[in-house]
Design a protein with these regions (language model features):
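N-terminal alpha/beta PP-like core and its mobile active-site loop of ThDP/TPP-dependent enzymes
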Residues: 6-175
Length: 175
């Protein structure tokens, strides 16, 4: 019989462990309040975050970096209006068959659908531009969902989206 040992860590740590497992070392975009908790641990994890002047630039740079190096990168934007700036680069990456991790922070689960601060229907926005998309609904599944999204991007040779409500961060989970 196999015994599975669980380790407690924060959802941010679990997210970064999955990025490391897949060799993602570069992220591009703008980090807003909905993604802020994770940015502090990128440097120690060997992940370089390249802050850009506009989300569109981040998406285009991520696409170019991935195509030039053959290494998947990540693009992230602030929820709502910031996410809309990723439309052109993500569709471009889709047409270029670029495997790209698209991270879209979102309003909190409890306020979604109520017209909260900078709320946009982010899943609908990208549904025709990604090979796969999934939203995290349970903090204990952040690593599982992220792993699946990255794997689908590699297999589909196209961008894949993980939508993460802001209340998924700063949770302690068993991994």
């Amino acid at each position: 019989r196999k015994v599975l040992l669980m380790t407690k860590m924060t959802t941010e740590e679990a997210f970064v462990k999955v990025l490391q497992m897949h060799g993602i070392e570069h992220a591009f975009g703008i980090i807003g309040s909905a993604f802020m908790p994770i940015s502090d641990i990128f440097p120690d994890a060997g992940i370089t975050f390249w802050d850009v002047a506009h989300e569109t630039n981040g998406g285009l740079i991520a696409d170019g970096y991935t195509r030039a190096t053959g290494k998947m990168s990540m693009v992230v934007a602030q929820n709502g209006p910031g996410i809309t700036g990723l439309v052109t680069p993500i569709k471009t990456a889709y047409w270029n068959h670029t495997p790209l991790l698209v991270v879209t922070p979102q309003a909190a689960n409890k306020t979604m659908g109520q017209g909260g601060f900078q709320e946009v229907e982010q899943m609908n926005l990208f549904k025709d531009m990604v090979c796969y998309q999934e939203e995290v609904r349970d903090p204990t599944r952040v690593a599982e969902v992220l792993n699946r999204v990255i794997s689908k991007a590699f297999r589909g040779s196209a961008p894949a989206q993980i939508n993460i409500p802001r209340d998924m961060w700063t949770q302690v989970v068993d991994i």
